[in-house]
């Protein structure tokens, strides 16, 4: 139960209070619950969409996007912004890229990337709501957080003594594979929609991981957050394109 609470506290803005400071082992095990947190967030978005039925589609999409950002505290958007600044400003140099990621200030590249990301999500939400295909509301956050579990399972963490290092070092690998297998099976049970979502998430994961390895030799907390946002966006936009035909 405690690892689940740790995952909820870290991945959401919900007021979760832990009984004590988590141990590295508990932090590592919390990764196993990341897909469950994604499923929970997706269920909340689906419920909100049901409650907003009858409202203007534009307003529905805007409110759902605002809720999505509020529930996550914009944590992963921050990672995306930092990664965007660092990737451009690092000029291919790993040390400079890592240094820029530590800078709390956001440059113009970060702002542009965030605007594009939010516009894409808003537009995709509008399409899936109008097409009455709410499965995308669940699949996007689920696969985004499953991607984090997969990332820490197979990718080195490059910042020594960071939180990510404790997560990766204490992740039960056999259980992680079982959790990922359950996610895959669950998506496949949804038929063509689930298969498309899995494919989009998988391709995005592989491309992003390849970029991380080439530039940094591994991942950081910021690039992990960027990966989550990219996977969510790819799944949401891809499913919107499917239903919009």
Swiss-Prot record:
Q: Which InterPro entries match?
A: CobS
Q: Name one Pfam family in it.
A: CobS
What does the record list as coiled-coil region(s)? Answer: none
Cysteines engaged in disulfide bonds, as pairs:
none
Biological process (GO) annotations held by this record are:
cobalamin biosynthetic process
* Catalytic class of the enzyme: transferase
Catalytic activity of the protein: alpha-ribazole + adenosylcob(III)inamide-GDP = adenosylcob(III)alamin + GMP + H(+); alpha-ribazole 5'-phosphate + adenosylcob(III)inamide-GDP = adenosylcob(III)alamin 5'-phosphate + GMP + H(+)
Q: What membrane topology does the UniProt entry give? A: Multi-pass membrane protein
Q: Per the similarity annotation, which family is this? A: Belongs to the CobS family.
HAMAP family linked to this entry: CobS
Quote the function comment for this protein: Joins adenosylcobinamide-GDP and alpha-ribazole to generate adenosylcobalamin (Ado-cobalamin). Also synthesizes adenosylcobalamin 5'-phosphate from adenosylcobinamide-GDP and alpha-ribazole 5'-phosphate.
What's the name of the protein? Adenosylcobinamide-GDP ribazoletransferase
| Name of the gene | cobS
């Amino acid at each position: 139960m405690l690892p689940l609470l740790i995952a909820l506290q870290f991945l959401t803005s919900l007021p979760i209070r832990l009984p004590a400071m988590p141990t590295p082992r508990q932090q590592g095990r919390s990764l196993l619950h990341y897909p469950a947190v994604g499923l929970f967030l997706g269920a909340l978005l689906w419920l909100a969409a049901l409650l907003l039925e009858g409202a203007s589609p534009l307003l529905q999409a805007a409110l759902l996007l605002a809720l999505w950002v509020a529930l996550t505290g914009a944590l992963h958007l921050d990672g995306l912004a930092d990664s965007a600044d660092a990737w451009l400003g690092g000029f291919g140099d790993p040390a400079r890229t890592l240094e820029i990621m530590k800078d709390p200030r956001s440059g113009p590249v970060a702002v542009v990337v965030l605007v594009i990301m939010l516009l894409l999500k808003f537009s995709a939400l509008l399409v899936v709501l109008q097409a009455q295909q709410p499965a995308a509301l669940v699949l996007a956050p689920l696969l985004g957080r499953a991607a984090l579990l997969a990332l820490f399972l197979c990718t080195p963490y490059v910042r020594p003594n960071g939180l990510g290092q404790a997560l990766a070092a204490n992740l039960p690998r056999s259980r992680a594979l079982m959790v990922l297998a359950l996610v895959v099976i669950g998506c496949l049970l949804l038929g063509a929609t689930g298969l498309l979502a899995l494919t989009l998430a998988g391709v995005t994961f592989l491309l992003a991981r390849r970029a991380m390895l080439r530039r940094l030799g591994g991942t950081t907390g910021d690039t992990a957050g960027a990966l989550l946002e990219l996977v969510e966006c790819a799944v949401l936009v891809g499913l919107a394109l499917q239903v919009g035909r």
